[in-house]
Swiss-Prot record:
This is Iron-sulfur cluster repair protein YtfE. Keywords: Cytoplasm, Iron, Metal-binding, Stress response. It comes from the Bacteria. Belongs to the RIC family. YtfE subfamily. Its main location: cytoplasm. Di-iron-containing protein involved in the repair of iron-sulfur clusters damaged by oxidative and nitrosative stress conditions.
Length: 220
């Protein structure tokens, strides 16, 4: 099956582990989820046929949960428990680790200078963002008022873009989240945690941008 003309966001939701494949190729399937596979591959100078072949293999596996057809209230509850609560645990721990690594290894050229600052910015932005969703937008959608939520949804999507930009800065600061040979245990653990955060946050944004928000605006 040809996947090149399908949007990345749709592929990430319909094919098991497609999101991990896109992460491997540094393709943005959350904020950039509306771009086609062909367009995204061209921008990264990648062979779209190779990626299509990998997607075809992944598509043979059964999908765990198809959120595209789940009730909106169920999607919202899942987002809060699986992503919001998790981000609230992840970021404070990563900030502590980054503070330690930047202090202890300040003299090393490979130290990720500024990482603590960027993680703190992401934590503050996400904390405010998630609170607005939980207190304003999500209740509107659960009450069947999603079609009237164009304003709040537009703001949330803009904030998703800002979070995505911060992730790019964090990846640049950490050499694409790759620890140097001299990295200590804390440094390696922190990078593992950052990779997990990036995976979670991209899946989180993808589910909202590509499923929850469009369906809510359509009046479901």
């Amino acid at each position: 099956m040809a996947y090149r003309d399908q949007p990345l966001g749709e592929l990430a939701l319909s094919i098991p582990r497609a999101s991990a494949l896109f992460r491997k190729y540094d393709m943005d399937y959350c904020c950039g989820g509306k771009q086609t596979l062909s367009r995204a591959a061209a921008r990264k100078e990648l062979d779209v046929e190779v990626i299509e072949a990998e997607l075809a293999k992944l598509a043979e596996q059964p999908i765990e949960k198809d959120w595209r057809s789940a009730p909106l209230a169920e999607i919202i509850d899942h987002i809060i428990v699986r992503y919001h609560d998790r981000h609230r645990e992840q970021l404070p721990e990563l900030i502590l680790q980054a503070t330690k690594v930047e202090r202890v290894h300040a003299d090393k050229p490979s130290v990720p200078k500024g990482l603590t600052k960027y993680l703190t910015m992401l934590h503050e932005e996400l904390s405010s963002h998630m609170m607005k969703e939980e207190q304003i937008l999500f209740p509107m959608i659960k009450q069947g008022m999603g079609s009237q939520a164009m304003g709040p949804i537009s703001v949330m999507e803009s904030e998703h873009d800002e979070a995505g930009e911060l992730l790019e800065v964090i990846k640049h600061t950490t050499n694409n989240v790759t620890p140097p040979p001299e990295a200590c245990t804390t440094w390696k653990a922190m990078y593992n945690g950052i990779n997990e955060l990036i995976d979670d946050l991209m899946d989180h944004i993808s589910l909202e941008n590509n499923v929850l928000f469009p369906r809510a605006l359509a009046g479901e």
